[in-house]
């Protein structure tokens, strides 16, 4: 059986890893969708799809399950979102998500969907990690070591700090 789990992974953290480990115990193969693949260089989405593919691939490489990491660009039409996802990924039998809308969309499309309890959601949340990076607080203990390596390789902390100096959309203020 092949499962599917989507996330923005901005960055991939230990909560994601915990969820992936739980799913891996239930499936033979796992498709990990990199959501919002077209977004990068903003405070909400500082990392590119390619950088997130590196993070996720390295973080799950030792799991005993065949894993496919697939970037998926946003589609602002919920009624056809599941078919968009299916067109971008290997076929899967079951979708996993903790997002009620995502679960509902898969169920309406006839795909079995399962949730999982959040793992340490109080600190294992992307916005919290990005804030810690911006303010120089410890974030490394909350992500797999391989993710720390990728973020250091791309100078990701400096990037997000620079982005945070601009406006809320991650774009430079206009001169007007």
UniProtKB/Swiss-Prot annotation:
Tell me the classification of the organism that encodes this protein: Archaea, Methanobacteriati, Methanobacteriota, Stenosarchaea group, Halobacteria
- The top EC class is transferase
> Primary place of residence?
cytoplasm
Alphabetized SUPFAM superfamilies for the sequence: Nucleotidylyl transferase
Protein family per UniProt? Belongs to the archaeal NMN adenylyltransferase family.
Q: Is Chaperone among the key words of this record?
A: no
A Gene Ontology molecular function term for this protein is: nicotinamide-nucleotide adenylyltransferase activity
Which pathway does the UniProt entry assign to this protein? Cofactor biosynthesis; NAD(+) biosynthesis; NAD(+) from nicotinamide D-ribonucleotide: step 1/1
What is the official name of this protein in its record?
Nicotinamide-nucleotide adenylyltransferase
Q: Which NCBIfam families match?
A: arch_NMN_Atrans (TIGR01527), cyt_tran_rel (TIGR00125), PRK01153.1 (NF002243)
**Catalyzes what?**
beta-nicotinamide D-ribonucleotide + ATP + H(+) = diphosphate + NAD(+)
Q: Name one GO cellular component term.
A: cytoplasm
Task: List all disulphide bridges recorded for this chain.
Answer: none
């Amino acid at each position: 059986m092949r499962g599917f789990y989507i996330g923005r992974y901005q960055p991939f953290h230990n909560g994601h890893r915990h969820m992936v480990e739980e799913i891996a115990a239930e499936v033979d193969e796992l498709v990990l969708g990199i959501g919002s693949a077209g977004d990068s260089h903003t405070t909400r989405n500082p990392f590119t799809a390619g950088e997130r593919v590196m993070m996720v691939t390295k973080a799950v490489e030792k799991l005993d399950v065949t894993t496919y990491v697939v970037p998926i660009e946003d589609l602002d039409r919920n009624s056809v979102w599941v078919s968009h996802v299916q067109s971008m990924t290997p076929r899967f039998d079951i979708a996993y998500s903790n997002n009620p809308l995502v679960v509902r969309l898969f169920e309406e499309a006839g795909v079995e969907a399962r949730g999982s309890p959040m793992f340490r959601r109080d600190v294992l949340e992307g916005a919290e990690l990005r804030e810690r990076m911006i303010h120089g607080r410890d974030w490394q203990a909350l992500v797999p070591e391989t993710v720390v390596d990728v973020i250091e390789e791309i100078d990701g902390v400096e990037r997000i700090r620079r982005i945070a100096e601009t406006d809320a959309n991650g774009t430079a203020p206009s001169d007007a």
